[in-house]
Amino acid sequence: EYRNLHILGYSFSTGPSPLSNLCQEMRGRRNRRKYEIMDYLRSKGVDIPLEEVEALASGGVVGRPHFAQVIVRHGYAAANHEAFDRWLDTEEFQEINNRFKVDARTCVEAVKAAGGKASLAHPYQMKLEDEALSALVGELAGYGLDAIECYYPRHTAAQQTLYLRLAEKYGLHITGGSDFHGERVKPDIQLAALELELEWLL
């Protein structure tokens, strides 16, 4: 229902757990998804080599940023964000993407079962009205959500204020991030520093 809902996990055990099982399942889903993405892109006239996309992932899970970089490399878009706007973040693409997702409750509960803390990442991406977002955060808090990412480069001042208010309303901790995924994945985003109270993660 919420197309860009991301859950971050902190301080979880890396041993066998429902979370490790879920991650293994998701890797399998992502591996199958890449072939459907290739078919989708070709149907739009974007013909790129899958081998180049896989090479960017360096043996890891292939994601949309890898596709975006290769799309740019082959001249179909001028920048990664254009590749997302035109193909990789459209309603039509989400119909493909949604078949490979896991619901938020499963994610939160898996992180918690592994002894970790769960945070809702970059809430602005869900493009929800304030009341709808508040209801969603309340629902996630009921599943055991620990925090909400209030500080993020693309959050406006008004959005940041709203998220801080929601954190207070639902008794959630505050996290922040730059969305840095490495130079090969998101070369236009640099690792940033942010001072926050993080004793709750220990």
Regions found by a protein language model. Give the residues of each.
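Residue-level recognition of alpha-helix initiation/capping sites
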Residues: 32, 62, 102, 131, ...
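Flexible, glycine/proline-enriched loop segments at strand-loop-helix junctions
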Residues: 20-29, 55-57, 94-95
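Conserved acidic, metal-coordinating active-site core of Asp-based
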Residues: 57-123
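Conserved phosphoryl-transfer catalytic core
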Residues: 28-55
